[in-house]
């Protein structure tokens, strides 16, 4: 009788501590798509304004959704019907095969491992569905997640999306972790009270190492192969 009671206590403790869901950013986390995004914005801005913006000008607006970034670059409101969103999607699709032909090596296997461990998988991207969803399909990842939420043109809403995921799945903050590459991902995860794995395996990740470390991520990995073993320990 005592042993059964002890086992119930152990199982209850295990269930309370076990990680239940993993949320992933897309660009720079599941695939090296940041150069693709930057080139899409630069090319379209040049078509519209005649001026090709510098890379830093483009990335300075990251955190906003596609319409938010594009609107800033071409001097238009994100809800302006004339904003060339369709053309942006066209350019993005044209460049995708050459600039981002596949997800990071091991990404598919890692996601399958997370799912096999019984954890839910979510996507939280600052992009909007019209560019995030095509990338997930192109990479063959569209069947490997359970829920997705995207960005807004006026502000970074990843903290709100994390809170939304917890509400949808009835989770506590300790039962969920976010995996993202940008300094803002760390800030947004902390704001939501969620642990953050700073994904530092993209080719350009070292450029933001100082900024990321200054924000004290819970974990920082430079090799995606280390991610699944970490998640299984949490």
Name each model feature, range by range:
Residues 53-57, 80, 143-147, 173-177:
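Short acidic capping loops at alpha-helix termini that bridge into adjacent secondary structure
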Residues 126, 200-203, 224:
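Short secondary-structure boundary segments
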Residues 140-148, 209-229:
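Structural recognition of alpha->loop->beta junctions
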Residues 19-109, 117:
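N-terminal helical cap/lid subdomain that shapes the substrate entry/recognition surface
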Residues 158-186:
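Conserved Lys-Pro-Asp/Glu-containing loop-to-beta segment of HAD-superfamily phosphomonoesterases
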Residues 46-48, 69-78, 108, 112-122, ...:
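Substrate-recognition/cap helix-loop segment adjacent to the acidic, metal-dependent catalytic center
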């Amino acid at each position: 009788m005592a042993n059964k009671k002890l086992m119930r206590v152990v199982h209850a403790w295990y269930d309370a501590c076990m990680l239940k869901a993993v949320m992933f950013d897309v660009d720079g986390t599941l695939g090296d798509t940041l150069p693709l995004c930057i080139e899409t914005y630069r090319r379209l801005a040049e078509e519209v304004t005649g001026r090709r913006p510098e890379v830093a000008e483009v990335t300075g607006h990251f955190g906003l959704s596609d319409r938010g970034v594009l609107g800033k670059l071409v001097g238009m409101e994100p809800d302006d019907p004339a904003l060339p969103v369709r053309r942006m999607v066209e350019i993005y699709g044209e460049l995708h095969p050459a600039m981002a032909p596949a997800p990071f090596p091991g990404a598919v296997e890692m996601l399958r491992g997370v799912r096999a461990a019984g954890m839910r998988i979510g996507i939280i991207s600052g992009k909007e569905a019209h560019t995030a969803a095509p990338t997930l399909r192109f990479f063959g990842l569209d069947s490997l997640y359970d829920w997705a939420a995207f960005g807004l043109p006026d502000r970074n809403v990843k903290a709100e999306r994390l809170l939304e995921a917890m509400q949808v799945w009835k989770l506590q903050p300790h039962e969920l972790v976010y995996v993202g590459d940008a300094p803002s991902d760390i800030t947004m995860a902390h704001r939501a009270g969620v642990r953050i794995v700073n994904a530092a395996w993209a080719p350009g990740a070292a450029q933001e190492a100082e900024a990321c470390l200054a924000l004290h991520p819970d974990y920082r990995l430079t090799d995606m192969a280390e991610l699944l073993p970490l998640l299984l320990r949490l």
